Amino acid sequence: PHQLVESFKSTLDEVREADILLHIVDISHPNFEEQIEIVNKTLAEIDGLDKPTVMVFNKIDAFNYEPKEEDDLNARTSLNNSLEDWKRTWMGKAEHSIFISTLKKENWPEFRELIYEEVKQIHSKRFPYNNYLY
């Protein structure tokens, strides 16, 4: 939440030391898009946007939406998007994003592989002649 950001800025300064950021999003929260925006603004304020970031959309098991009836003439809102709809947006198309359920371990092997590949890439750049680990 934005009201807590100021008190946590010193903690968030650790972002500058990180090699990779995991941006964990509670996709079941009705305002998750706003929360993403707040995190991105905060990262920009502390010069943290230049870090490799993996977007992790968690709690897919708890995700709910309001299906839009075919005869409903009201404008479609983000509340009408199914999980599959969200996966067809930038959220699912981004190279470094994944939809998971930590509770039910859905897409857990894919998540682990994604993190492994990201760390491997960073390690290979930092230590180019030390690839025996992979």
Locate predicted features.
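C-terminal-of-GTPase-core extension/linker across diverse P-loop GTPases
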Residues: 30-134
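Short, solvent-exposed loop/turn segments at secondary-structure boundaries
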Residues: 1-4, 33-34
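Inter-motif core of Ras-like GTPase G domains
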Residues: 4-29, 41-49, 101
